[in-house]
Amino acid sequence: MCLIKPACQLAGFYLLKLINSIVMLSLSSMNKEYNNVVLVIGNGFDLDLGLPTSYSSFIRSPYFDNHVSTTQKGSDTWNSPPGSEYLFDFLYSQIDWKDSRHLDAKKWVDIENELINFATRGNGMLSSSLEADEKEKKMFYLLQDELCNYLSNISYDNVNENSYAIKVLNSVNNLLGEIISFNYTDLSKLNQFLSNPLKVPIEYVHGKLADKTIILGVQDNVDFDPSYSFLIKTFSPHYKSHNVRKKLLNADEIIFFGHSLGNTDYHYFQELFKRQSNPDTAKDNLFMRIFTFDEESRRNILLQLREMNDKRTNFLFDLCDFELYRTKDKQDDTKIEGYLEALKKRIHQGLKKSRKGISCC
């Protein structure tokens, strides 16, 4: 019996496996040089477009206001008796309606804090945990449904086609781009304002308005009675993994637009900023930009970063190409336009390398 032929076949099999491994390793190495651009968007992105998606716009609308009792509207404090909709009264009472600045300053992070206050406001309003679970769960889901109804009916007629939001979206709308949205609004509705229809992968962390899977609530680290577990985001049937941390840590360029980096989403970003502020763990050649509204919001974000990176923000500036831009009244227009032009060139070079790598294989 001849053993040479089987031996040659076996050798050929392992040789093919070795070649395949080398090719995959080479591709992996090449990919590290590509520009993988991740755009992270929060409510400020929608507002820059001109969409009325703020918390203050919602609570001014009939979708919210119609559920507030007449008694509550005539009072400065929360005095509503238990009823099927008194969560709306409670949220209404947390606002100084005489101060328009206070109302306009309300953000989505505030409703999460107020839901915590609602769940921890003290005993005596309800006779039992079971009652709390059923009545208040009903109110919470009604609030969520009305928010969904409100956002589903906003008009896109007045979208600012010259906004920075549209410019950034056009910049990342390519094979190297990816979007992580903390908004509920459907980005595909912006296709009419873009140079090309969106073709990038989009992760909707808080659910998607189009299929009514929005997630409203609080984070896991909040302590309150288990009967209020329906308020926790991870308890939502729509909650799922989006690998946000991994995507950010693997990115070559990260753009935050209109996200406050506040406590409610703190856990998604802490590791990134901590690692990038440490000389031993920082990723080389990382580009990072944060688009925010004005000087006050810029300072607030720097305070958030200071918390996340153990007061080492100076290292963050040193260890990556990092800058913050203010969009209000085009304060940083020259810087922003310069950045978008440089981003365009980096993406173009990355796409060229990508095509060469594919053609070689």
What do the PLM-derived regions correspond to, one by one?
Residues 51, 55, 59, 155-161, ...:
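Phosphate/oxyanion-binding active-site loops and adjacent basic polyanion-contact surfaces
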Residues 49-50, 189:
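Short N-terminal helix/helix-N-cap motif within the alpha/beta-hydrolase-1
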Residues 2-15:
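Positively charged N-terminal leader segments that act as targeting/secretion signals
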Residues 70-239, 250:
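Extended, H/D-rich, highly charged conserved domains that either
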Residues 55-59, 196-198, 272-273:
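Glycine-rich, phosphate-binding/catalytic loops in enzymes
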Residues 62, 191-196, 276-279:
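Active-site catalytic pocket residues across diverse enzymes, especially alpha/beta-hydrolases
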